[in-house]
Swiss-Prot record:
Belongs to the UPF0091 family. InterPro entries: PhaG_MnhG_YufB. GO terms for molecular function: sodium:proton antiporter activity. It holds the Pfam family PhaG_MnhG_YufB. This is UPF0091 protein RP266. It comes from the Bacteria.
């Protein structure tokens, strides 16, 4: 029963992280900072929620599957985020500072 309440607490922490990441996603000005907010949501909050659901789950096989999914997300999401950031850098997507400097110079 204690594991159930720990799982609920961990899921609440994960949901708080998701909502704060969503707020950051809408408030950040350019692609790269929005990419950072999205990767924090996917790399931190989703695995935390999955581990919380694994604590709540009574069946051991389902708990192992949830923990395995959380580990895969923790390992693979930073690679995907890096590839997306590098591709956008190679495509020369401008940052907020360069756009702001061009407005100031005019």
């Amino acid at each position: 029963m204690t594991l159930y309440y720990i799982g609920i607490l961990v899921v609440i922490i994960g949901l708080f992280s998701i909502f704060s990441g969503i707020i950051g996603f809408f408030r950040f000005p350019d692609f790269y900072t929005k990419l950072h907010a999205a990767s924090v949501i996917e790399s931190f909050a989703v695995p935390i929620c999955l581990i919380g659901f694994a604590c709540i789950e009574l069946d051991m096989l389902n708990s192992i599957k949830l923990i395995l999914a959380a580990l895969l997300i923790l390992l693979l999401n930073p690679v995907a985020t890096h590839a997306l950031g590098k591709a956008s850098l190679l495509m020369k997507i401008r940052t907020y500072n360069t756009v702001l400097l061009k407005k100031i110079r005019k």
